Amino acid sequence: MFRIFSLHISPWKVLLLLGDAVCYILSVVIALYLYPLMVAPWRFLGENKLAFLSIGAIYFLVLFIGDLYNYLKDYRQIMNIVHVLIFSWIGTVAVVVIFYFPSKVGYVGRSLLVFQAISFSVLVASWRFAFSVVALPQRMEKRILIVGAGKAGRYLLSAIRNRPGCGFLPVGFVDDDPQKVGTIVDGLPVLGDSSQLPVLIPQHNIPLVVAAITRERSARLTESLIKVSWINCQLIDMPTIYEFLTGTLPTEHISDNWIFEWNVNSSKIYYLRLKRLIDLTLAVIFLILTSPLILITALLIRSEGRGPLFFLQERVGQNGKVFNIIKFRTMIDGAENCGPRWTANNDPRITKVGRVVRKLRLDELPQLINILKGEMSFIGPRPLAHCSSMEGIPYYNYRILVKPGITGWAQVMFPDGLTVDSTPEKVKYDLYYIKNIGFLLDLAILLKTIRIVAFGRGW
């Protein structure tokens, strides 16, 4: 696995992206040489490099929205190849819509774009097919040993088994408890104790050892783990691989050390200041652009009868500060007179207009005011009402380290409706975001949000 700034990224996903970049470059070169009116292709490319870079960025964005950087897909299947071809041409349409009405970007004409689009769609589909032929068998077979057959080790084993094709194949446990050695734990054998690692690793062809020990490590265990690196084997701790697999924090199996590191990281200060400036700028722009939509929504809500246009509810923000979140009212007036409760599917309290407004996410637009006031950000954990029953969730209160957002990591990775039962799981996603916060992770959330909205999946 790779870690680029704050984001865990699979090397297979990086390989897909690099392959697409090569396909795009080749498609441009092919188009320049096939275009009959082209006299000096390299000079033309140099003079219009910004235009070609912009077009390439649009292609990559559309492919991401189409979920075509999912390296677990088998692109040998005809429907997945058709999926690739469809979205490569959607990318072409997006280029035309964005740059070619009414004129053109740089000096890249429409005819040249057709040559490039045909070349790119054929190349990227061929690359995806080749990727699956070569890489699909390889990525299923990374054999691992789990050091620790206790709760943390079993927790990791369950996460791997729940994600077929994730790229990891547990071979067995290693544990220093003599009563466990030689037994079967959750269907996996305990092959020996930690002192046997130098023998077990080559014997079972193990390239990766995972230390799933939450208690204090003994001197013997520490010495055995150090020896792992001496025999050309990678050593990684359980929380890191669990984060990579699930996009969550294993709250029951981590210490408080990460939060101390977060607080002393000076780069976070500059990130938060720049993010505030971006939030402020974008909020002003979006308020201006969406003002007609806000007016129409307000009129439609008013047409259903009397009652306030906006729904205000107390939420807990950064550093525990309580604020009123602003939404368009989508329920009957007085729907929460008996106190707030979770919204269910087909909730009878939701009005006809409100149902449409919620489906299109238009009820979130007034939260631009919360962003202007500095109470929220575009991206961050969703603001929740104060609830004493949630304080028993490990690290729940750490959510207030950052500003709440309109969309967040929990919403794009766990897109089902929020209920009391799902809150602990969503908090794990929120904590992952806080621990790994950064612009790259924000960009990933933004792109995943666009994908969810485009395909109509819930938050």
Predicted regions, residues:
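Signature of alpha-helical transmembrane segments in polytopic membrane proteins
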Residues: 1-140, 144, 168, 459
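A solvent-exposed beta-alpha-beta segment
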Residues: 29, 34-36, 40, 131-248
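Membrane-cytosol interface motif
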Residues: 84-88, 140-159, 308-331
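Short, glycine-rich, amphipathic interfacial segments at transmembrane boundaries or analogous
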Residues: 178-181, 242-252, 310-349, 406-430
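Glycine-rich flexible loop motifs, especially short His-Gly-Gly/GGXG/HXGH segments used as catalytic or interaction
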Residues: 246-285, 309-313, 415-439
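A hydrophobic, helix-centered structural microdomain
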Residues: 270-334, 370, 439, 444-459
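A short, structured surface patch at a secondary-structure boundary
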Residues: 343-404, 445-449, 453
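C-terminal terminal-structure detector
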Residues: 351, 373, 395-459
